[in-house]
Regions:
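Metal-dependent phosphohydrolase cores
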Residues: 1-161
Length: 161
């Protein structure tokens, strides 16, 4: 997990996560803090193991850690967070020791994690990220559930596969 720790220690990652924590400090809805990012990473890794997929653990964690990092940029300038996150990943991942191929895979996953799960098998990492991101939310115990703009059918009623 040397490369994952390099992401966590990267100055740009730390700066954007601190900014996001500040911007979301009063947010009533789901936050995009380190706890969320690690929840997504762990759910992704469980999915990879259960399905017997051959995806490097560092790549899984990189996608999870970076997938919402662009939210601060979205809140400040309106740039979609998946686009801002992809740009941040382009800067952080090479510094953390990820290859060009790994970086491209993580960027593709970040770019597609907001829409519907991709059907293309080449986008497996994006599909896993999409599912884990949605599954990570504890809607059933959220105090702001009634005010949330997610449709009821998208809100998690409990822990599910």
């Amino acid at each position: 997990m040397k490369r994952v720790n390099a992401i966590l220690r990267h100055p740009l990652f730390a700066e954007k996560l601190r900014l996001l924590d500040t911007l979301e400090a009063e947010r009533a809805f789901c936050r995009h803090d380190l706890t969320h990012l690690l929840d997504v990473a762990r759910l992704m890794w469980i999915d990879v193991l259960e399905r017997g997929l051959e995806i490097d653990r560092d790549v899984v964690y990189a996608a999870a850690l970076l997938h919402d990092l662009g939210r601060a940029e979205q809140m400040q300038s309106g740039i979609p967070h998946e686009d801002a996150g992809a740009m941040l990943a382009e800067r952080i991942l090479p510094d953390a020791g990820f290859s060009a191929e790994e970086t491209d895979a993580v960027i593709a996953a970040i770019r597609c994690h907001r829409g519907s799960a991709p059907a293309d098998a080449r986008e497996m990492l994006g599909e896993i990220l999409y599912r884990a991101d949605k599954a990570s939310r504890t809607c059933w115990r959220c105090g702001a559930r009634g005010a949330c703009n997610w449709p009821e059918e998208r809100k998690n009623a409990g822990i599910a596969r």
